[in-house]
Amino acid sequence: MEKWWWFNSILSNERLEHRYGLSKSMDSVNGIEYTKDPILNDTEKNILGWSDSSNYSFSTVDYLFEIRNIWSLISDDTFLVRDSNGDSYSVYFDIENQIFEIDNNSSFLGELESFFSSYLNRGSKNKYYHYMYDTQFSWNNHITNCIDSYLRFEIGISITSYISGDIVNYSDGYIYSFICTESVSSNESGSSSIRTSSNGSDFNMRENSNDSDINKKYRHLWVQCENCYGLNYKKFFRSKMNICEQCGYHLKMSSSDRIEVSIDPDTWDPMDEDMVSIDPIEFHSEEEPYRDRIDSYQRKTGLTEAIQTGIGQLNGIPIAIGVMDFQFMGGSMGSVVGEKITRLIEYATNESLPVIIVCASGGARMQEGSLSLMQMAKISSASYNYQSNKKLFYVSILTSPTTGGVTASFGMLGDVIIAEPNAYIAFAGKRVIEQTLNKTVPDGSQSAEYLFHKGLFDPIVPRNPLKGVLSELFQLHGFLPLNQNKKEN
């Protein structure tokens, strides 16, 4: 579904000739046919779909730009677009304040900016200002409603990397990725081109931009997928459980977000929140003292350590849960992490609660030396008493990455071991293995899917159904919701 038809409309003036594949060619705007979608039929003017192949050249921009629906689409929005060559740039609109900015140095973009400013200065916006959307609605609902109501065109409009006067195929260098709330769709039979002229002579232009610079500049708006490099709108990313909208890849998730989606509201009771490391071996690196580094991560993440532990309810079932956070020193396991997990398991043993530990760690924390390695044995000992002696139920959830001492200890000790899709799970990393053994590690040999077929753990469960899967597992092992226990008693 196209969202950018309005962007191309600003290109259509006496210096920017923009051709479309329309149903027929004619000399006046009034003759343009109505679209097939009844919602789009305007008794005054309407833009046709993209399906047919004849050409029509627009000579004025007022008709295109002063359609009343344009004010239902944009007010104050930033859009990031990327073409098939990987070049990206951003477009910022603020029509109320007469601001139009494009983050690129191309003279073509300067042409657009100049034209847009002159358009606003003509006072055209007053005519249709009352059609601006109501700001009481959320951005998401506004965009969704606009798309559903007005943009059911079959038109494929985009800006080419090489702008020429010839008609070319849509797939040959046109912008194919429009970063908004939905992915772009196009009709392969359509074609479009843009020709610019300066002082009577034609010339070609190419937009160039650095993806990394744009990602840094707009990272407060977008989250880039590690797998497909697609961009996800940050406001909606948490509600989608940090799953990429483009490819379904599971990105890293903070411990607080995991607790929020896993534990029932108003049931979370944290344990040992104030426990912090005292730098037992007085580790000092050339770059930064260990204590300063701990303080830095505490300010950055709002956590005291690389794990949150506590008691809560999962669909009404009381549980003890520990969630590691990779954002805090790579989720490394030091003395505090080991002590908090041990206390959690001991509490669950005394209260006969099921235990969940969500693993996301690079392994033992080197800044605490052998003391961090001892946490592996300590946790394993507490887990043995919990599982073998008390016959209670422990579920281990392996997320990306789970490596080192965590994999070698409590990560693989669960009665049921669950992995997330595409999770990186290993004891030693690929680089370490290759440098130590002088052997090449095949790509994908440390992914959850490969290890699942080798029998390393039980199911691979995506985040969306995970809470329901855990609830069924607990009930299967005799852990029932509190309200159900009361009814049976």
From Swiss-Prot:
Record localization? Plastid, Chloroplast stroma
Residue segments, region Disordered: 185-209
UniProt cofactor note? Binds 1 zinc ion per subunit.
Pathway listed for it?
Lipid metabolism; malonyl-CoA biosynthesis; malonyl-CoA from acetyl-CoA: step 1/1
Which GO BP terms, alphabetically?
fatty acid biosynthetic process; malonyl-CoA biosynthetic process
The Enzyme Commission number assigned here is 2.1.3.15
Alphabetized, the UniProt keywords read: ATP-binding, Chloroplast, Fatty acid biosynthesis, Fatty acid metabolism, Lipid biosynthesis, Lipid metabolism, Metal-binding, Nucleotide-binding, Plastid, Transferase, Zinc, Zinc-finger
Q: Which residues bind Zn(2+)?
A: C225, C228, C244, C247
Q: InterPro entries given for it?
A: AcCoA_carboxyl_beta, Acetyl_CoA_COase_Trfase_b_su, ClpP/crotonase-like_dom_sf, COA_CT_N
Where is the major localization of this protein? plastid
Q: What is one term from the GO cellular component aspect held by the record?
A: acetyl-CoA carboxylase complex
Q: How does it assemble?
A: Acetyl-CoA carboxylase is a heterohexamer composed of biotin carboxyl carrier protein, biotin carboxylase and 2 subunits each of ACCase subunit alpha and ACCase plastid-coded subunit beta (accD).
Protein name (database record): Acetyl-coenzyme A carboxylase carboxyl transferase subunit beta, chloroplastic
Species: Dioscorea elephantipes (Elephant's foot yam)
Q: What is the lineage of its organism?
A: Eukaryota, Viridiplantae, Streptophyta, Embryophyta, Tracheophyta
